[in-house]
């Protein structure tokens, strides 16, 4: 496995930020680079990529744009910044891919690493592609482990990605052969407020009844009397959780509550539901997020025999400073638990883990 080098910097002028990163990267062999830029620099992404390739000599690059980017112990949110990492992988151990915008593209995209079957992949996705969830699931079926990690571009400008060039519109990233060893974990940051319920009547994303009772009545019982008295207070605190069938870790997909109809006692969530589906309600707050982050980091640490060589971290834009605090607290937790090692990533508009899209999660992947 290669060793990794990394750099990160903020500057209004993209060249200043890029040069600061390149200086930190230093000299040494590298075959693959990871490049994340904040959306304030999105309009210059092509120039930034060309500059990194020219100045470092690294031939292959992957990455994307985020409202925020991150590096070891550091978060850059709402400022012009770049985070980059480089590793010297064997030539036949990885393959950069792009142009996956439809089901047919998933079937046809070249993922083999030399002659080796791809084992897993790091993926960046365009949130404006309405098939993105299905594309992620299908692409996971093309890699041997069935495991993808990554995130959806988050940008107030262009939703651009890097895959040996600047691309957009679908999925891109890099696949790896099984001689590239990784460890990965996910942290949810929410805690259930009540038991699982069965959807007994629904229409598209509107829940009519749960367990044979009016959906809003069940919801109010679960969230408790204090919140139920003033439903205007639940925004950003209470979410719908959709348990993942067959998960041995109790994982669930977190979806926003998008509407409440008190007169008809209905609830609308950010997901289409069929009768028979399971749903629960959960709460997101700083205490819960810290506890689950600590659990995740302890879990991944216990499975390691040495310090990570490098890593990537993909966290929801709804986490970071708004959930953990303003002084890069989320990234500092990783450093404190696992030590100082090269790490880069970005704050996503949806996170990819295994074969699914998540929300309000953090996905940590370590090269070991």
Language-model segments: residues:
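Small-residue-enriched flexible segments
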Residues: 1-53, 59-60, 64-324, 328-341, ...
């Amino acid at each position: 496995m290669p060793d990794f080098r990394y750099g990160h910097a903020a500057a209004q002028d993209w060249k200043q930020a890029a040069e600061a990163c390149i200086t930190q990267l230093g000299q040494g062999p590298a075959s693959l680079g990871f490049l994340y830029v904040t959306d304030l620099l999105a309009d210059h992404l092509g120039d930034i990529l060309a500059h990194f390739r020219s100045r470092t000599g690294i031939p292959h690059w992957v990455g994307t744009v985020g409202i925020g980017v991150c590096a070891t112990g550091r978060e850059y949110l709402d400022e012009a910044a770049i985070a980059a990492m480089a590793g010297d992988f064997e030539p036949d151990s990885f393959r950069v891919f792009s142009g996956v915008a439809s089901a047919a593209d998933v079937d046809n995209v070249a993922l083999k690493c030399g002659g080796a079957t791809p084992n897993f992949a790091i993926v960046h996705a365009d949130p404006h592609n309405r098939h993105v969830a299905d594309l992620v699931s299908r692409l996971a079926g093309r890699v041997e482990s069935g495991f993808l990690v990554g995130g959806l571009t988050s940008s107030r400008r262009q939703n651009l990605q890097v895959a040996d060039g600047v691309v957009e519109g679908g999925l891109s990233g890099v696949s790896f052969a099984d001689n590239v060893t990784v460890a990965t974990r996910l942290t949810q940051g929410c805690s259930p407020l009540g038991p699982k319920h069965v959807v007994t009547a629904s229409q598209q994303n509107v829940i009519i009844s749960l367990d044979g009772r009016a959906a809003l009545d069940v919801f109010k019982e679960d969230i408790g009397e204090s919140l139920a008295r003033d439903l205007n207070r639940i925004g950003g605190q209470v979410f719908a959780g959709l348990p993942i069938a067959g998960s041995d870790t109790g994982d669930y997909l977190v979806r926003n509550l998008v509407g409440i109809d008190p007169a008809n006692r209905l609830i609308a969530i950010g997901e289409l539901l069929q009768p028979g589906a399971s749903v629960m309600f959960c709460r997101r707050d700083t205490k819960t997020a810290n506890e689950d982050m600590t659990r995740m980091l302890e879990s991944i640490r216990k499975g390691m025999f040495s310090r990570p060589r490098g890593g990537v971290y993909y966290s929801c834009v709804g986490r970071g400073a708004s959930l953990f605090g303003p002084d890069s607290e989320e990234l500092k937790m990783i450093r404190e638990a696992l030590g100082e090692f090269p790490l880069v990533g970005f704050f996503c508009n949806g996170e990819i883990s295994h074969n699914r899209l998540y929300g309000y999660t953090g996905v940590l992947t370590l090269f070991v």
